[in-house]
Swiss-Prot record:
Name of one Pfam family that matches: ATP-synt_ab
Chief place of localization: membrane
Nucleotide-binding is among the record's keywords: yes
Entry annotated with the keyword Cell division: no
Protein name: ATP synthase subunit alpha 1
InterPro entries linked to this entry: Alt_ATP_synth_F1_asu (IPR017710), ATP_synth_asu-like_sf (IPR023366), ATP_synth_asu_C (IPR000793), ATP_synth_asu_C_sf (IPR038376), ATP_synth_F1_a_nt-bd_dom (IPR033732), ATP_synth_F1_asu (IPR005294), ATPase_a/bsu_AS (IPR020003), ATPase_F1/V1/A1_a/bsu_N (IPR004100)
Cellular localization per UniProt: Cell inner membrane
Gene: atpA1
Binding-site list for ATP: G169, D170, R171, Q172, T173, G174, K175, T176
Stored NCBIfam families: alt_F1F0_F1_al, atpA, PRK13343.1
GO cellular component: plasma membrane; proton-transporting ATP synthase complex
CDD domains: ATP-synt_F1_alpha_C, ATP-synt_F1_alpha_N, F1-ATPase_alpha_CD
Annotated positions for site Required for activity: S362
Length: 510
């Protein structure tokens, strides 16, 4: 009997000596107050700036204001059930987001929660949403074009891979349509896309997603969504989370396109949070660091050097202007940060000129270096002719008597504008664009009635299907458009236009 107890005590002693309690320290604070999208927390003296906190109901928050006795927290979820006295736990790390190939084709929110009902994302790899932008010596120049499939942009305002090109204009002028056309045109071009909807209406986001699915673009696209009825904290972190997802692919040597739709809502969300947290307001009530939140975001878009894989991240931020005022605070900030802008004019939109790109107010500062040589050979004269037309058209509206040369310039310009029109979700291939541009610069459309221009332009595009593969390869290379290739394209265009009316009334306003 004693030997049995001795054995039992020996086992207990051995277990006691080998036992190592799995203690995990936790820092717990308490909510002192809750407001719209924010909370004040006390009792966490060691918390760091931007650190992630856990609230009851698995709601996350970011330590935004770190004061001596209290923390201002931006909430990243529904906060209606939170109240003063609830416990808050430090998590010891910053906000991160899941990344990886398994995200392609998925719809998520900025903290990685799937919204498409397809289950878990199937990835364990995560990246912080805030990451430093690449160093200067880690970057390469913008040298490869990003074809948008939109004639007026690819010809006159070209975009390169690794560029930041701002899209701005009043509401309902086609800004999202420009971005969507660009995404649709990346099909088969080895470019991954990330579409970030920031504070958008649910119906608008649903329409975008439906279009991506119908056109087969979800096969190479990740969608990050925050809706307008969600807390402003989610809208604030959304573009940073989307950029980290895109950077993962860029750092693998891949080309990525990211669309921020739109940064006006992002700026307003940040203004709302800053005012609620009692940060000092500045111009238009925006906080003093409003420029910095966008510059540190857009500086992450770049073309990496060959040593780092040569990947690229092209950014198309969208901004909404009010009453065509591009000199307002947020638009001028973004214009100064980006490498150019595409301005959409309400006046052109109302006239049915779509896309409503105002070429005179649009510019691409670095994209011209990346534009294919075949474009450069035909667009130099086109830009000059279109600029002259826009200037002279103003005088023609006042009924001024114009000489024959001026009337010819105006009629030619009207045909340029007619050829640059394009319906949405109908990207045009490079060969078709070159064929139309070559025909324009050779004045082949000048004898065609304006009413017949859409059909004539389509006929030239259809004729471009007969361009031989070797010519198409040269067009898509860095070679200039040779005289022989140009002659072949011109002959195809002439044959396509033979059946159209040559009835024109020079000088008659249309």
């Amino acid at each position: 009997m004693m030997s049995m107890f001795d054995g039992l005590f020996a086992d207990l002693k051995q277990a006691r000596e080998s036992f190592e309690p799995a203690l995990s320290p936790r820092e717990i604070g308490k909510i002192t107050s809750v407001a719209t999208g924010i909370a004040k927390v006390s009792g966490l003296p060691n918390v760091g700036y931007d650190e992630l906190l856990l609230f009851p109901g698995d709601i996350y928050g970011i330590a935004f204001n770190v004061d001596e006795d209290e923390i201002g927290v931006v909430l990243l979820g529904e906060y209606w059930h939170l109240q003063a006295g609830d416990e808050v736990e430090r998590l010891g790390h910053v906000v991160d987001v899941p990344v990886g190939d398994s995200l392609i084709g998925r719809i998520i929110n900025p903290i990685g929660k799937p919204l498409d009902g397809k289950g878990n994302l199937g990835t364990t790899e995560r990246l912080p949403i805030e990451r430093p932008s690449p160093a200067i010596m880690d970057r390469a120049g913008v040298s490869v074009p990003l074809q948008t499939g939109i004639k007026v942009i690819d010809a006159l305002i070209p975009v390169g891979r690794g560029q930041r090109e701002l899209i701005l204009g009043d509401r309902q002028t086609g800004k999202t349509a420009i971005a969507m056309d660009t995404i649709l045109n990346q099909r088969g071009k080895n470019v991954l896309c990330v579409y970030c909807a920031i504070g958008q209406r649910a119906s608008g986001v649903a329409k975008v997603i439906a279009t991506l699915r119908e056109q087969g673009a979800m096969e190479y696209t990740v969608v990050v969504v925050t809706e307008g009825n969600e807390p402003p904290g989610l809208a604030y972190v959304a573009p940073y989370a989307a950029t980290s997802i895109a950077e993962y692919f860029m750092e693998q040597g891949r080309d990525v396109l990211i669309v921020y739709d739109d940064l006006t809502h992002h700026a307003r969300a940040y203004r709302e949070l800053s005012l609620l947290l009692r940060r000092p307001p500045g111009r238009e009530a925006f906080p003093g660091d409003i420029f910095y939140i966008h510059s540190r975001l857009l500086e992450r878009a770049t073309h990496l050097s060959k040593e780092l894989g040569g990947g690229s991240l092209t950014a198309l931020p969208i901004i909404e202007t009010e009453a065509q005022d591009i000199s307002a605070y947020i638009p001028t900030n973004l214009i100064s940060i980006t490498d150019g802008q595409i301005y959409l004019s309400p006046a052109l939109f109302e006239l049915g000129i779509l896309p409503a790109v105002d070429v005179g107010k649009s510019v691409s500062r670095v994209g011209g270096k990346a534009q294919r040589a075949a474009y450069r050979g035909v667009t130099v004269d086109l830009k000059l002719a279109y600029a002259q037309f826009e200037e002279l058209e103003t005088f023609a509206r006042f009924g001024a008597r114009l000489d024959d040369d001026t009337l010819k310039i105006i009629e030619h310009g009207r045909r340029i504008r007619a050829c640059l029109k394009q319906p949405e979700f109908a990207p045009v291939s490079m060969a078709e664009q070159i064929a139309v541009l070559v025909a324009l610069t050779a004045d082949l459309f000048d004898d065609i009635n304006l009413d017949n221009m859409p059909a004539a332009e389509q006929a030239v595009r259809d004729a471009a299907a007969n361009i031989t593969d070797d010519i198409v390869e040269r067009l898509e290379s860095t070679d200039k458009l040779s005289k022989d290739d140009k002659a072949v394209i011109l002959e195809l265009a002439r044959q396509a236009l033979e059946t159209f009316s040559t009835d024109t009334d020079l000088g008659e306003p249309r």
